[in-house]
UniProtKB/Swiss-Prot annotation:
This is JmjC domain-containing histone demethylation protein 1. Substrate binds at T297, K317. The gene is JHD1. Its EC number is 1.14.11.27. InterPro entries: JHDM1_Histone_Demethylase (IPR050690), JmjC_dom (IPR003347), Znf_FYVE_PHD (IPR011011).
Amino acid sequence: MLQQVTSTTVTGADIQLRAKLLLFSMTDDQCVYCKGKMEHRMWVQCEACPQWVHVQCIPEECLSGGEYPSRSSDIAAFECSAHGTARARLALKGKRRRVEAKEEPERAGTRRYRLRKRGPLDYIALNEGQDVRLRHEHPHRAAFQGCFTKWSGLGRTVTSAELQQSFAELREPVLVADPEHSGMQTPAMDEQVLADVLGADYSLDVMDVQSQQNERWTMGQWKEYMHTARGVRDRIRNVISLEVSHVPEFGQRIRRPRAVEDNDLVDLVWPVQPAPEIGAKPKVQKYVLMSAANAYTDFHLDFAGTSVYYSLLRGAKQFLLFPPTPANLGAYKAWCADDNQGLIFLGDRLQDGVSFSLRPGDLFMIPSGFIHAVYTPEDSFVVGGNYLCLRDLSTHIRIVRIEQETQVPKKFTFPKFERVMGLTAEWLLEGLPERLQLITHEHAVALLDYLRDTRLKYKPAHYHTKSTMLASLEKALEGCEPASGP
């Protein structure tokens, strides 16, 4: 690290000479202090030029708050010493504030003019794309809109009766024409209601749209953020993992569509009075999703390729979806493994897409394994949930293997999936031969192969070991051919 700047008197000529020498020696992606390229460190870019530096390399006397920030979102502004000042300046946000404080009138005009000219910078680390992003628009938005238009007009709409009667054959996303007849019910809900019921200190994950990374906030902070005018919010944010089935005020009053209630595999196989080692059902059935306008969730697979029901209470949503074909899943895996993933718009590499626009009151159903991205034109509030089903057993297992190959963190996988598969095997054996007729041969083989993995630990309730359970299931399959499938 270079020697820190001292506090000795510096003349105007000295400042100009130093600025010229510094600009001459700069390279955009090399820290001017340590000359290194240590990408594991937090970086920040100068507002007035393309220069990046390591935050920890900035001299302490240049810090407005006297201490280094712990994360990039704490940084309000940075200006290097090559722009007519004796030393660099790193300004930090107030610790308890989510939006920038009002500036003095004489500076506010200059600041507003600058924002109109180039927009506020996003101080995400250099190794997350090496591009200067705008805080209020995700860089893939234009590509998303082009792809959305390309695949528009292909979406299908069904009635609630058709959804119920033809659920086993449903292989594409659909809008429900008459959601009021689907069985879906939700109480009156918004951010204020959530804060009142859960409490202002309730902790939740909030996604930063630009980085697609989560931060821990309180419900009170989120309510304050959503009640802040769009133009002064510090960043675009999303809440997509707030599960509320355990909250009596919501869990008991939110009713899922009948087609979901009738086909949820967990409800089908989970014991009414589970043993302590089995425990409670996975909490994935009832989520609240809240998004600020311009929020964007990049392409993803829902954990274990679960199917999704999605009821929009307020705002607007745009979905872009692609089926789980071998080619699309292969492109998805390659994209996940690419070091430049954040710079690549995956939609340009996928085929057979479909797009949907959702408005308040819409009920949307996504079948298993669809790769999708979501854009939010307006502040929105959604109730939805995930579910496994016998119809898609082999797809669920295929997606779980992709999650393993792409090293998805356990936090973002389906809770207790191995246990659900073990319980499914026991449930099938308890109802021979009729229950085997409910799944295809492909599903049965996929289930057996998955459970045979020696790394998978499962203790059956009615068999001495997992091996004896699987032997019984294999023998049953030999004498009872499962359904042939659609």
